[in-house]
């Protein structure tokens, strides 16, 4: 591995500075906060003044962890602004692809939610109902509550990665299928 790559990876293993965590926390929308809570298994009902500094209470928050989260949330400009990694450049993208702190299933479920329309989300839930004969979940009008209910419901089912991917492919959403393939190939790279 090139010296500069090793240096960048070493840099990313450092703790993320508190001012960066606070700045990023202020930039998140309400729905992005729900995504962050799900990615890190935080309590949905607890309100945090700053979501990312709250993570430091239960885990070591490195730059790489934050970069991985921002990558999933498609906040690529923030990765560039705060960490000088432009994921549109192959070398920088190689660095970002090394991070795999967040379980792949959680990443897939957040991306599924982010990249699908309300009808596609409901179709996914209907497929779960048909496949597993579990109680039916109907989405309402409140996007924040929908996300919380969706994540909790899907988590309770303990779907295997393969079943999850099979159902996602059945949605026939080109963007989400391409994103899943990309994420899975990055995950393989990081091993």
UniProtKB/Swiss-Prot annotation:
Keywords: Membrane, Transmembrane, Transmembrane helix. GO terms for cellular component: membrane. The chain crosses the membrane at residues 50-72. Its main location: membrane. It is a single-pass membrane protein. It holds the Pfam family Herpes_U15. It is found in: Membrane. The keyword Transmembrane applies. The keyword Transmembrane helix applies. This is Uncharacterized protein U15.
């Amino acid at each position: 591995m090139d010296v500069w790559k090793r240096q960048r990876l070493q840099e990313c293993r450092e703790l993320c500075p508190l001012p960066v965590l606070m700045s990023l926390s202020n930039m998140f929308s309400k729905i992005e906060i729900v995504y962050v809570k799900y990615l890190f298994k935080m309590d949905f009902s607890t309100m945090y003044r700053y979501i990312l500094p709250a993570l430091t209470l239960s885990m070591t928050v490195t730059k790489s962890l934050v970069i991985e989260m921002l990558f999933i949330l498609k906040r690529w400009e923030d990765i560039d602004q705060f960490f000088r990694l432009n994921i549109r450049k192959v070398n920088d993208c190689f660095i970002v692809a090394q991070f795999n702190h967040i379980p792949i299933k959680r990443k897939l479920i957040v991306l599924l939610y982010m990249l699908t329309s309300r009808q596609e989300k409901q179709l996914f839930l209907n497929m779960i109902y048909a496949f597993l004969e579990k109680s039916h979940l109907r989405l309402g009008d409140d996007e924040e509550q929908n996300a919380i209910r969706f994540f909790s419901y899907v988590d309770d089912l303990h779907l295997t990665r393969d079943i999850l991917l099979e159902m996602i492919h059945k949605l026939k959403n080109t963007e989400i299928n391409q994103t899943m393939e990309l994420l899975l190939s990055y995950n393989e790279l990081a091993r």
